[in-house]
From Swiss-Prot:
Keywords: Chloroplast, Membrane, Plastid, Plastid inner membrane, Protein transport, Transit peptide, Transmembrane, Transmembrane helix, Transport. This is Protein TIC 21, chloroplastic. Involved in chloroplast protein import across the inner envelope membrane. Also acts as a chloroplast permease regulating the iron transport and homeostasis. Involved in the uptake and sequestration of iron in plastids. InterPro entries: DUF3611. It is a multi-pass membrane protein. Ubiquitous. Highest expression in green tissues and very low levels in mature pollen. Disruption phenotype: Seedling lethal when grown on soil. Albino or chlorotic dwarfed plants that accumulate unprocessed precursor proteins and chloroplast ferritin clusters when grown in vitro. One of its GO terms (biological process) is protein import into chloroplast stroma. It is found in: Plastid, Chloroplast inner membrane. Disulfide bonds: none annotated. Residues 1-90 form a transit peptide. It comes from the Eukaryota. One of its GO terms (molecular function) is protein homodimerization activity.
Length: 296
């Protein structure tokens, strides 16, 4: 029996069917008419490729002293024909105005912070410098006159506190230089020093003041204890009696060590107060709100 074979099975899953001659004639006149099935087109079954955007690299954002500037990520929706653009073109000028408002607030805050750093840095620098120099002169004078330290522990503890005070003076001068840098970068906030670096410097200055204050306190306590021991020894040996061997009365130079330790403590106290206030001003939450203009 002869049969007419249709084309072999295609990739779309249509299989070949064998038709008889009689059925072929009727199929040619009835089925393959103007009302016949549409011709098979493999292109219609091919999967449509969608043009999507898997990732979008947003422009780098600028974060300066609590403000986030720029970095807005536009939203694209998948489309089979073309990219979908924003429907409201007026949103771009609105974002620009918001960024300008944020930049103005950042510049204003940088200028205010620079003035605060300069004021407190100058107070801490000059106050610590005077107190530390006076303490160093008193300690040196007592050593030169007596020829040797009255108590080695007292001398070394007080000297360590004075050395830490000089380091704190140098740190306070760094605050003044930082204020000038902040004032220059208020025009271009992108060049401003990061807040993390400023906070790290302030914390380092606070640690120097705490260590120096502790050393000066130890020196003062040792000096006071030594003077109390001397005073008790002097009261046990009146002047009208014979002076025993090894007797050493309380001298004015011994009291100078107390004054040196007190000046060192004052120096570290000034530096600590200024550093803590500057740290508070930098890390305090920003209460200023950015006014967002309404786009018509």
């Amino acid at each position: 029996m002869q049969s007419l074979l249709l084309p072999p099975a295609s990739s779309s899953g249509v299989s070949a069917v064998a038709l008889r001659p009689g059925f072929q004639h009727s199929f040619n006149h009835q089925s393959l008419s103007t009302r016949s099935l549409p011709l098979f087109n493999p292109l219609l079954l091919a999967p449509k490729k969608k043009t999507t955007i898997s990732s979008y690299q947003s422009p780098p954002s600028l974060s300066v002293y609590g403000f986030q500037i720029g970095g807005s990520k536009p939203s694209f929706t998948p489309s089979t024909v073309a990219f979908s653009y924003p429907t409201s073109p007026s949103s771009v000028p609105g974002d620009n105005e918001v960024d300008k408002a944020k930049l103005a607030q950042v510049a204003k805050r940088l200028e205010k912070t620079s003035r605060y750093f300069k004021r407190l840095g100058s107070i801490g620098f000059w106050g610590q410098l005077v107190s530390t120099v006076v303490a160093a002169v008193i300690l040196s004078f007592s050593i030169v006159v007596t020829g040797k330290p009255t108590s080695p522990a007292t001398f070394y503890a007080t000297a360590s506190g004075i050395a830490a005070a000089f380091v704190s003076v140098f740190w306070s001068f760094g605050y003044i230089r930082l204020s000038e840098r902040l004032r220059r970068t208020s025009i271009d906030p992108a060049k401003a020093p990061p807040r993390a670096d400023v906070v790290k410097g302030l914390r380092s200055g606070i640690m120097v003041n705490i260590l120096g204050m502790g050393s000066a306190l130890l020196g003062m306590q040792a000096t006071v204890g030594f003077l109390v021991a001397k005073a008790l020894t002097t009261s046990a040996n009146p002047f009208y009696q014979g002076v025993s061997q090894g007797y050493s009365p309380v001298l004015a130079l011994d009291v100078f060590l107390v004054q040196a330790s007190a000046n060192t403590l004052l120096s570290h106290f000034l530096g600590l107060v200024c550093s803590l206030e500057l740290l508070r001003s930098v890390t305090v939450p920003n209460s200023e709100s950015v006014v967002v203009p309404k786009v018509a």
